């Protein structure tokens, strides 16, 4: 069964088209108009071994908020659709990932119950053209539109670029772990019988 999903979403602020293959090889085709954000999404694709096409046109003349938040909303919806009924998958994923001086923990549960928790604070307002406060908005949007419980903890770090890159890569590894099939799981991994 292919775990591929595509979604297009057009508003007055953004025009977004995303395709995600959970069982890919890490190929990214990303264009959001925000260079650092493109770099992070390419890292997510590569380190999660997801094939990701993400074409975004946003009102960057205003700022980067709508572009980044709306991309998170659509990516979360695509993740949810690609995961499907969740039968046979691990459901949980955790990664502690180093990125130079930064050490980030990401843990998630594809429970269907959205929740976002993070203790991450940045010392700079921007990395390239991306506002660092948008990192929270992006992952919050993913957690709610995908229906996942998502936690980040920054165990060490001082360079905002390294910290953000560590978050995107750790999220990719944790999501890859959570969506991995386990032959011992014959149904949905829940005492309720559904997620």
What are these regions (language model features)?
Residues 1-195:
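N-terminal intrinsically disordered, cationic/polar leader segments
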């Amino acid at each position: 069964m292919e775990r591929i999903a595509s979604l297009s979403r057009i508003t007055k602020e953004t025009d977004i088209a995303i395709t995600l293959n959970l069982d890919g090889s890490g190929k990214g085709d990303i264009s959001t108009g925000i260079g650092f954000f493109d770099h992070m999404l390419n890292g997510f694709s590569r380190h999660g071994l997801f094939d990701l096409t993400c074409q975004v046109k946003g009102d960057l003349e205003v700022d980067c908020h709508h572009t980044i938040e709306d991309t998170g909303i659509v990516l979360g919806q695509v993740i949810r659709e690609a995961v499907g009924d969740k039968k046979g998958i691990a459901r949980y994923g955790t990664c502690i990932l180093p990125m130079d001086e930064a050490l980030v923990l990401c843990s998630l549960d594809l429970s269907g119950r959205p929740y976002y928790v993070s203790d991450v604070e940045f010392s700079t307002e921007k990395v390239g053209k991306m506002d660092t406060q948008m990192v929270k908005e992006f992952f919050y949007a993913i957690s709610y539109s995908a229906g996942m419980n998502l936690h980040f903890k920054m165990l060490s770090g001082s360079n905002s670029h390294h910290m953000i890159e560590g978050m995107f890569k750790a999220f990719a590894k944790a999501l890859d772990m959570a969506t991995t099939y386990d032959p011992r799981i014959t149904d949905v991994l829940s005492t309720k019988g559904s997620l």
